[in-house]
């Protein structure tokens, strides 16, 4: 087999492949043998029918088509391996020669990872927001803690903001009751905004057993998106009594003896939460600083796949109803055109980020260890509320483990650069990034980038070379090894 590669653009190539007919003859023999087992021809035992009779019965062209369809994917994969191309997405394949007894020829156009000239990281510096825990934030945490230890007491007065009420609900569209839209004994905190839009305004001022009708859009069912007349009836009213914020409360609600000690602990909790946000800001600022220093060509099909993933996520919550999605955008003061423009811009930036970090990980010789993958599995499984083993099985069955590997590898690349960067906050304070990302390696990142050693491949946990071209979403743009 012969193959050659033509560079069409920084992000796309055309691979030309020629397969000698002699290489396909064994495929023909196997195909005829299998076909002979499946058909019965008069005068011949199963599996004994001559090739010429099979060709006369089924046609040589049909057999040739089948052989070519089976041969192209494997030969395409072989051409990729020989040329060391890292494809992004599925190829566009065209068979240019297909005749019995002649060489098979086809071309495959596919997007590829572009060559990226990495920026000079010497003196890289980023700035992030300063953080502090304000008294208001500490008080809010204290109020939340007091609410957890509060008691509900029934009151004989109209509903007010902050009350806890029990209500009955029913809905009608065009005067007809809506099935499955009625509920009794629902608990609701007034002004929490957790149920139907307009409900809080409707119940304020009502007494027990009083009702009010208001208009709201139904979110689900056959009448989803339509205006309905909703009737709410108040069945009970309770108010929450909070414990006094004193030393006694501190001893009840925590391991501390005094309210001052409890406040100090809450202040540290607020700061810790903000440090998590600051770490994320450092990551993003580091990536943005890198992107400002380098030009990253973007494969259009890769950007399109990323955009389609964003759109799919947005539509999945409303049963893929694009008309309703467009209505919701208008209700929010936006439009479909604005959404598409923002989503495409974000998708293009995300693709640039992925490609840059893949190239950076190559040059830094990033190694993804078992602990790194396990940590990501645990964190992701917590987000979905499932066991890590369940998530692992799902990713394995859906061929998404390579995608997770690539994401972890990119994260380690960002971490390495952030460790070496100078990070300050808006107040001029230098931030010790080791608190977020650990200590930098003995070899400086900038030294590693100057290393002349080959850095075209990452290393996986077993020490094998690993192609890192997989996108963040394996379903949206997977690395193709077939003619698909």
From Swiss-Prot:
Give the enzyme's main class according to its UniProt record, as a single word: isomerase
Q: Where is the composition biased (Acidic residues)?
A: 444-476
Can the keyword Transferase be found in this entry's annotation? no
Could you tell me what reaction this enzyme catalyses? Answer: [protein]-peptidylproline (omega=180) = [protein]-peptidylproline (omega=0)
Q: What is this protein called?
A: Trigger factor
UniProt-listed InterPro entries: PPIase_dom_sf, Trig_fac, Trigger_fac_C, Trigger_fac_C_sf, Trigger_fac_ribosome-bd_bac, Trigger_fac_ribosome-bd_sf, Trigger_fact/SurA_dom_sf
Q: Where is this region: Disordered?
A: 427-484
Q: Which domain of life is it from?
A: Bacteria
Q: Which UniProt keywords apply?
A: Cell cycle, Cell division, Chaperone, Cytoplasm, Isomerase, Rotamase
Main location class: cytoplasm
Q: What is its EC number?
A: 5.2.1.8
Species this chain originates from: Mycobacterium ulcerans (strain Agy99)
Where in or outside the cell is it found? Cytoplasm
Offer an example of a GO molecular function term for this protein: protein folding chaperone
Where is each PPIase FKBP-type domain found?
162-243
The record's family statement is: Belongs to the FKBP-type PPIase family. Tig subfamily.
A GO cellular-component term linked to this record: cytoplasm
Comment, domains: Consists of 3 domains; the N-terminus binds the ribosome, the middle domain has PPIase activity, while the C-terminus has intrinsic chaperone activity on its own.
């Amino acid at each position: 087999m012969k193959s050659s590669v033509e560079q069409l653009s920084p992000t796309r190539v055309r691979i030309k492949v020629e397969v000698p007919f002699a290489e396909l003859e064994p495929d023909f023999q196997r195909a005829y043998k299998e076909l002979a087992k499946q058909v019965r021809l008069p005068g011949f035992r199963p599996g004994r029918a001559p090739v010429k009779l099979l060709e006369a019965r089924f046609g040589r062209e049909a057999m040739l088509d089948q052989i070519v369809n089976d041969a192209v994917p494997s030969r395409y994969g072989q051409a990729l391996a020989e040329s060391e191309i890292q494809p992004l997405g599925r190829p566009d394949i065209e068979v240019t020669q297909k005749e019995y007894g002649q060489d098979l020829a086809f071309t495959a156009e596919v997007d590829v990872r572009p060559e990226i000239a990495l920026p000079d990281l010497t003196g890289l510096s980023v700035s992030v927001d300063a953080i502090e825990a304000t008294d208001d934030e500490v008080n809010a945490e204290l109020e939340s803690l007091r609410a957890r230890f509060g008691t509900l007491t029934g009151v004989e007065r109209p509903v007010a903001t902050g009350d806890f009420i029990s209500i009955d609900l029913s809905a009608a569209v065009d005067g007809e009751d809506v099935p499955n839209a009625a509920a009794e004994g629902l608990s609701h905190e007034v002004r929490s905004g957790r149920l139907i839009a307009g409900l809080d305004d409707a119940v304020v001022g009502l007494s027990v057993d009083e009702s009010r009708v208001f208009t709201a859009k139904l979110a689900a069912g056959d009448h989803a998106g339509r205006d309905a007349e909703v009737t709410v009836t108040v069945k009970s009213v309770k108010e929450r009594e909070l414990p006094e914020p004193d030393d006694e409360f501190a001893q009840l609600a925590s391991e501390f003896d005094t309210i001052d000690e409890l406040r100090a602990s809450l202040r540290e909790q607020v700061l810790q939460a903000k440090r998590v946000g600051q770490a994320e800001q450092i990551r993003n600022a580091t990536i943005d600083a890198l992107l400002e220093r380098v030009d990253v060509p973007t494969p259009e099909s890769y950007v399109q796949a990323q955009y389609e993933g964003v759109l799919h996520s947005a539509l999945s919550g409303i049963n893929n109803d694009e008309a309703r999605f467009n209505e919701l955008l208008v209700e929010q003061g936006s439009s479909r055109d604005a959404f598409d423009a923002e989503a495409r811009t974000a998708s293009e930036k995300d693709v640039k980020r992925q490609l840059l970090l893949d190239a950076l990980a190559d040059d830094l010789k990033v190694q993804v260890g078992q602990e790194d993958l396990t940590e990501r599995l645990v964190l992701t499984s917590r987000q979905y509320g499932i066991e890590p083993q369940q998530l692992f099985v799902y990713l394995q069955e859906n061929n998404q483990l390579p995608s997770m590997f690539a994401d972890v590898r990119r994260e380690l690349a960002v971490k390495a650069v952030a460790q070496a960067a100078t990070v300050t906050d808006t107040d001029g304070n230098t931030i010790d990034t080791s608190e977020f990302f650990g200590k930098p390696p003995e070899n400086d990142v900038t030294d590693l980038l100057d290393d002349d050693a080959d850095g075209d491949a990452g290393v996986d946990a077993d020490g094998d070379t690993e192609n890192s071209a997989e996108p963040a979403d394996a379903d949206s743009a997977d690395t193709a090894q077939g003619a698909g």
